[in-house]
Regions:
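Non-catalytic beta/alpha edge segments that cap or flank active sites
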Residues: 1-165
């Protein structure tokens, strides 16, 4: 069972001016037999606050996976990728690149996404878009593809290639 933290990053959501639908959608789409959501929080687009919450989930709660939603666009307040990179120990760019490539097959506007994917300690962090539709599409793609990486990160598996006979 993988432990998961979900962070919705939205000024309006944090202020109670907008209902968060993307964070709950992430939780809904996580297979219940494999993923246990241990934290869900809505925070504003504040770089330090985002970084602090990521550190808490990685270092204190020790989540295996942290999924963020929101703050990945071009708005001056969209700083989720920067806050994520601030606390990263290792980059895992293939995940964000693959998500963008998949999303590009659905809409050319996906090229405007700036989400990052990184590792801190034994936690994989993936920035997802903010819209419910984009979150749903991203989760469909992501869930079938990251478990092997999580297993390696957590020490459950050490082989990426086939074994010699």
């Amino acid at each position: 069972m993988y432990t998961v933290g979900i962070i919705t990053i939205s000024d309006k959501g944090a202020a109670g001016q907008r209902e968060d639908k993307s964070g709950p959608k992430i939780k809904e789409l996580l297979p219940k037999d494999k993923y246990d959501v241990v934290s869900y929080k809505i925070i504003p687009d504040e770089r330090k606050q985002i970084a602090d919450e990521l550190v808490r989930l990685c270092d204190d709660v020790k989540c295996n996976l942290v999924l963020t939603t929101g703050g990945t666009g071009f708005s001056p307040r969209d700083i989720t990728p920067e806050a994520t990179m601030d606390i990263a120990e290792r980059n895992a760019p293939g995940i964000a690149e693959a998500l963008r490539a998949y999303s590009m097959s659905l809409t050319p506007k996906a090229m405007l996404g700036r989400g990052a994917s990184v590792i801190r300690k034994n936690t994989l962090i993936v920035n997802l878009p903010g819209s419910v539709k984009a979150v749903s599409e991203s989760m469909d793609f992501l869930m079938g593809n990251i478990e092997h990486g999580l297993d390696i990160l957590l020490g459950y598996d050490s082989e990426c290639g086939g074994k010699l006979k």
